[in-house]
Amino acid sequence: MTLVGNFSPLVLVGDSDRVEAETVGAYLDGWAGHDKVRLATANAIKAILSGAGRLVGRIARGYLPGDPGKLVGVNSDQDQQKSIDVGSHNLFVELLIAAGVASILSEEADLPVAGKADGLVAVAIDPLDGSGNVGLGAPLGTIFSIFPADVEEPFLQPGNRQIAAGYVSYGNSVDLGFSVGEGVIFATLDPVSGQFHITRRNVKLPERTSDLAFNASVQRHLSAGMQAYVNDAFLGKDGPRGRNFNMRWLGAAVGDMHRIMQRGGLFFYVNDSRPGYEKGRLRLVYEANPIAFLAREAGGKATDGSRPILDIVPQTYHERSALVFGVAEEVDILGEYFVK
């Protein structure tokens, strides 16, 4: 019996045989116009989307060609690198250099990679967020931030100088969330055409949420104020918060970001008492910054517990930061506990 073959795709009731939604490429062309910095930004985003389309093809093949999770080295912070980490880094760097960017800062390289000498934008990127989930069917993603390259150290600028930011989520569909400073846009990759088509515009977070995303196994290591926040939430409608909360934790910042951008919620990964976690764990430049940019564009907030992420001036390329993001009201409430 043939289990798979060259069959036509499944068509559901209500499906259209033609995707007519605007492509991200067309949107970016219209946004950029003749502005040189905008054109450079658009070209960088297009390069990332091209890489995402190629990367998802390898992710989908799993272990068939070889082990994508094979350990092949360590990065600047001595985190173990998998084969797919290095491969995705090389892929995006190659495409971004071809797109004319000035420099690329990747989680997988100690120093920025030089690009075009007169390039107008610099790209900070985590080529494959959540690579610990490789082979498990759990979320993976690519997250990026684009800065003007008009200063000597473009990656040591505060996040409020970002021109654009976004992420690609590799799940049961390949979804893009991005902003060029004019609201958050969602798009989905059509595997037939190879194009990302826009599905939602001006995405906004709700005013209130009862969904929390954090690693509950480290609660005992949190500060007294943060433990009080968690305990009060877990008391539900019988506690001081007066309502029940749900908990979600996907183990990849892009996965949690994508869910929160669609359904609302609050994510936190803050500093705690464990060695190596004193300043938080996520990287400020290419994880916290793009998330904070998107949260702001969607009407939410992002802080390190007390300070707006977008106001923090990085001191090093791979600086770590605590991160709290999501629905603005809940970010503010957590902030009151954080400083206790």
UniProtKB/Swiss-Prot annotation:
Cofactor note: Binds 2 magnesium ions per subunit.
Entry binding sites for Mg(2+) 2: D126, D129, E287
Keywords linked to the UniProt accession: Carbohydrate metabolism, Cytoplasm, Hydrolase, Magnesium, Metal-binding
Localization terms from the record: Cytoplasm
Coiled-coil intervals, chain numbering: none
Binding sites annotated in the UniProt record for Mg(2+) 1: E107, D126, L128
EC number from the UniProt entry: 3.1.3.11
Record-listed substrate binding positions: N215
GO cellular component: cytosol
Cofactor: Mg(2+)
Predominant location category: cytoplasm
Catalytic activity: beta-D-fructose 1,6-bisphosphate + H2O = beta-D-fructose 6-phosphate + phosphate
GO BP annotations listed: fructose 1,6-bisphosphate metabolic process; fructose 6-phosphate metabolic process; fructose metabolic process; gluconeogenesis; sucrose biosynthetic process
A single GO molecular function term of this UniProt record: magnesium ion binding
Pfam families on file: FBPase, FBPase_C
Quaternary structure, from the entry: Homotetramer.
Family: Belongs to the FBPase class 1 family.
UniProt cross-references to PANTHER family, sorted A to Z: FRUCTOSE-1,6-BISPHOSPHATASE-RELATED, SEDOHEPTULOSE-1,7-BISPHOSPHATASE, CHLOROPLASTIC
Designated name of the protein: Fructose-1,6-bisphosphatase class 1
